[in-house]
Every structure is written in C-alpha cells, then in structure tokens.
Amino acid sequence: MVALFPAPLTPLGGLDAALHARGFAVLDAASVAALAGVARTDFDALLPSWEDLRADEYLKDGGRYRKRRHACCIVAAGVVHPVPHRMHYQPVEYNALHGGMQRWFAPIDASTLAQPAWPALVLALAGACSRQRPDVVRWHVEAHQFRIDTSDGVGRPTPEGAHRDGVDFVAVLLVARHAIKGGETRVFAAQGPEGQRFTLAEPWSLLLMDDARVIHESTPIQPLDARGGHRDTLVLTFRAAGFLGD
C-alpha cells in the first residue's frame, strides 16, 4: 500500500467561500456530481474515451508518456456552445517548455461530448467561476483529456513544473489512478509562502483553482510493478478574455 497525503476536502456548500478565501477548493466525487446535478455513475459513461487518446507529439523532453485529446467551447447564458476544433496555445510566460507555439491535438470524440454528464459538468464549473466573477458573461473553455503512463519508466503530469495556465480558473478532475505511486498535487500561493500537498485519489474528485492566485503542479508517477500504470485526468480551463492565442 502506498501512503497518500489526503486531499483537503471542502463541503459543497463551502465551495465558493473556499475559492474566494484561498484561491482553490477540493471536492469529493459525490459533491462534484451534486454540483453538476447528475448521478455519480453518469460520469462513468465518459470513461471509455480515455482508452482512445492520442500520443502527445509535442513533448520536448523526448517522452512518450502523455496521451491526450482536446476540445473547446463557449459558455454563455447557461448554454454550452461548441466551437470548431482549434489549436491549443500558451505563452512562454506560462509554459516555458511548450509555450509560444500552436499545438494541435486530436479532438475529443463527439460521442464523449454528447454524454449528458459532459455539458452538465462544464455548466456547473462555469457557474462556480461566475459566482467568483459575476461581471463575466461568456467563458471560453478548453477541455483536455490526459493519460500519463509509465511506458518510459516515469510519467510526468506537468513536465513544465509548477505553473499557472494564463486563464481565470482551472479545474482538474482525477479520472483514474492505476498501479502507480506519485502523482501528488501541489498548490502554492502565487504571492506568499503558503502551499499544500495532497493526492487526488477518488475518481471524479475535483481541484478548482483561481489561476491568478495559485500555481500548481503534479509530481511524476512511477509504476507499482512491471506491468506499468497510468493516471487519467480531465482538465478544464475557463477564461473570460477569449481563447489564448487569438
């Protein structure tokens, strides 16, 4: 058994206050489902899509450990509006390793986006962001499905290190941990000494962050045995001022 640092869970009713007070909040899966207004098991309809991700061809460390898919949408007036498939871009100020270039990833499959849990989750998270920023009428959302595996011996969820994403809010949902150690989440105040370390271990648990106020990273993963392992996540970013790179 690998010892894990427990996540500092926030009750659902305290989500807005925690996000306002410290710049991040962690919800368990039951709270995420309640926030989205779906059954916990509805999220499981999304799981098969993590078995069909595509290799990340842009890794500058030469690794083969990351697979992913990408999609974008706009949320306005309580409606999710899909947008044509587009590139993912981050300035070098936010991603010194992979920033400053257009990266085109395989799109998230239409059947995944059509699952009822998908728009329910996106709208619920957009609502949480809007309660922090009631002036925002339109959120530009990027969704990233990730699988980090141990095919290279070590998999790096954040090869760029501790970082901000250059957006307004970042949501990280743990989808699965299989036969690994590591993958510890670390969240630090962007201005100040405060920080916390913990492990998201429950499928569909959530870390929601105010990107201007905290920086974050996840530590490398290693396999528990020779058969290898992986860590699956869903990352959604919310930005008021358009998509990065526009």
Regions found by a protein language model. Give the residues of each.
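Structured loops at beta-to-helix junctions and adjacent beta-edge loops in soluble globular domains
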Residues: 30, 75-78, 144-146, 174, ...
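Conserved aromatic-histidine-acidic binding/catalytic patches
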Residues: 34, 110, 159-162
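Catalytic core of Fe(II)/2-oxoglutarate
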Residues: 184-246
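N-terminal auxiliary "cap/dimerization" subdomain that precedes the catalytic jelly-roll/cupin core
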Residues: 1-92
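Conserved hydrophobic/aromatic beta-strand scaffold that supports enzyme active sites
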Residues: 26, 145, 170-172, 206-208, ...
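Short loop/turn segments at secondary-structure transitions that flank enzyme active sites
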Residues: 33, 149, 177, 215, ...
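Catalytic core of non-heme Fe(II) oxygenases with the double-stranded beta-helix
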Residues: 133-202
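Signature of the catalytic double-stranded beta-helix
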Residues: 76-142
